[in-house]
Regions:
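N-terminal capping/small domains of soluble enzymes
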Residues: 2-106, 138, 149
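Generic hydrophobic/aromatic pocket-lining and core-packing "Φ" positions
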Residues: 47, 89, 157, 165-168
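Active-site-adjacent beta->alpha loops and helix N-cap segments on the catalytic face
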Residues: 137, 182-183
Length: 196
């Protein structure tokens, strides 16, 4: 019995490998960032199941780069967080699927419970304009705050690299801090130009 070769389809290209910078994805199907609240080993198992299911590239949910955006006691800017990264990226990488880690600062879209304020401090944003969704009143950022957030992005990205992540995706939409700085609603034009 002979088998006939499969008839080519318009979707065949989806299964071809693709290079994005230095990252080689197995195919053109990727798992986008979405929130899953699991500890690192369980999150790693969750992502690996998606790798087994056929995705060629994984983007994790967002990890916060600074205390003013932090939640749930996770401190990605601290060097010890590299071990957590290793725990959730390694299972997928063993299957040949690269993992990109999303990093973010929520800015005016941040939320705070009373215990969060005591532990992490106030929500920070370019101006004192609350998000229409979360309604937490942000504290306007000073230059030192901006510098600290930049350092938080750098430290978190370094931890991703140290933990074996294949890259980072910076999330700046949805009213988060980076989009706050680009919005004329949140800041004046001279301030926006200084920020850029």
């Amino acid at each position: 019995m002979t088998t006939q070769p499969a008839t080519p389809t318009a979707l065949d290209g989806l299964w071809e490998p693709v290079r994005i910078g230095s990252v080689q994805a197995l195919n053109r199907i990727y798992l986008p960032a979405h929130q899953v609240s699991l500890p690192p080993p369980a999150y790693g198992a969750y992502l690996a199941e998606r790798a087994r299911g056929g995705v060629g590239l994984i983007v994790t949910h967002g990890f916060h780069v600074h205390p003013a955006s932090a939640r749930a006691g996770v401190s990605p800017w601290e060097p010890a967080w590299a071990d957590a990264v290793r725990a959730f990226v390694t299972p997928s990488k063993r299957l040949g699927v690269p993992v990109i880690v999303q990093v973010t600062h929520m800015g005016a879209s941040g939320t705070r419970r009373t215990d969060d304020i005591a532990h992490w401090g106030a929500v920070l944003a370019p101006s004192q304009l609350a998000s229409p969704v979360h309604r937490a009143m942000p504290q306007p950022m000073e230059e030192d705050d901006i510098r600290a957030v930049i350092e938080g992005f750098a430290a978190t990205c370094a931890n991703v690299q140290a933990g074996g992540g294949d890259g980072v995706e910076i999330h700046g939409s949805h009213g988060y801090l980076l989009s706050n700085f680009l919005s004329l609603i949140h800041i004046s034009e001279p301030t926006r130009q200084e920020a850029i």
